[in-house]
């Protein structure tokens, strides 16, 4: 069994491999770490049996593959304690990371 793709999924897949091999010791599992797109491409073209992605599958990938979630993770935005803001809305995070705003004072208006 060849598994390929996301570097952030790889540690979880290594643990799943260990558990699987305990009950199926005669199976060979190779995990190839790269990125989500490479994993999906490999699954589509048949160079791997399982592709790993740490993002939602693209529509074009879903035409060829079936996605199965094995885990969810959280992402935090952290600011310095000197920052005047005590919290950020999802919309504020969006405008920061899209470059629509470039100063903290824009967030306090």
Positions of PLM-derived features:
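Flexible loop/hinge segments at secondary-structure junctions
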Residues: 1-109
């Amino acid at each position: 069994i060849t598994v390929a793709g996301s570097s952030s999924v790889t540690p979880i897949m290594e643990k799943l491999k260990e558990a699987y091999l305990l009950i199926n010791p005669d199976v060979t599992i190779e995990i190839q770490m790269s990125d989500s797109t490479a994993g999906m491409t490999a699954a589509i073209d048949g160079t791997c049996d399982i592709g790993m992605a740490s993002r939602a599958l693209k529509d074009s990938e879903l035409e060829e593959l079936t996605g199965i979630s094995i885990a969810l993770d959280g992402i935090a935005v952290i600011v310095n304690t000197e920052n005047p803001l005590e919290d950020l809305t999802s919309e504020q995070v969006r405008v920061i990371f899209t470059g629509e705003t470039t100063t903290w004072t824009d967030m306090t208006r």
